[in-house]
A protein has these predicted regions:
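Hydrophobic residues positioned within well-ordered beta-strands of beta-sheet architectures
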Residues: 4, 19, 70-72, 89-91, ...
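Acidic, Ser/Thr
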Residues: 24, 75-77, 126
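C-terminal functional regions that serve as terminal interaction/effector modules
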Residues: 84-85, 90-92, 96-97, 101-102, ...
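Terminal connector regions
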Residues: 8, 23-63, 105, 128-141
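Surface-exposed interaction/gating patches
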Residues: 40-104
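A cross-kingdom feature marking solvent-exposed beta-strand/loop segments within repeated
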Residues: 2-22, 102-124
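Intrinsic low-complexity repeat tracts in disordered regions, enriched in small/polar residues
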Residues: 1, 27-32, 92-93
Length: 141
């Protein structure tokens, strides 16, 4: 058994956040429980615009060294939101089995592109589990 606190940077109004990665020592737990904590008052501010992060061109390439690289592009589309210096985008890779259950996740970070422009990303994975489908999601970081 273990416990891990995962803090996410920001969520825009009505935005769904997908967070993928590994926790613990890599051993699949029997159960997973999530608890959303109430933020401290100083962490809640009025939205200063919004941003969305569409992903396109996602593909996979099997590498000669046994790894698999998932590639794609992510755009930053803002409506009044101004990123701070050094602001990044987190890209999460999600693998699903034939029942649609999430069985694996990994992540990468990319620099924030100019508004409406794309930034390429690559997520290298070794020892993939058997999976049926994959998808990627992006969020502000």
């Amino acid at each position: 058994m273990f416990s891990q606190t995962q803090t996410l940077n920001m969520a825009f109004p009505n935005q769904t956040i997908h967070n993928a990665g590994q926790a613990g020592q890599g051993t699949a737990p029997a159960t997973v429980d999530f608890v959303a904590l109430s933020p401290n008052e100083y962490n809640v501010t009025e939205a200063q615009g919004t941003a969305t992060f569409p992903i396109s061109g996602i593909s996979k390439v099997r590498n000669n060294d046994g790894g698999t690289t998932f590639n794609g592009e992510v755009r930053a589309v803002t409506d009044g939101f101004k990123p701070s210096d050094g602001q990044q985008i987190k890209v999460s890779l999600v693998l699903r089995d034939k029942q649609g259950t999430i069985i694996y996740g990994e992540m990468a970070f990319v620099d924030w592109p100019d508004n409406g422009q794309s930034m390429p990303f690559s997520i290298l994975v070794y020892d993939l589990p058997d999976y049926t489908s994959y998808e990627s999601y992006a969020q502000i970081w």
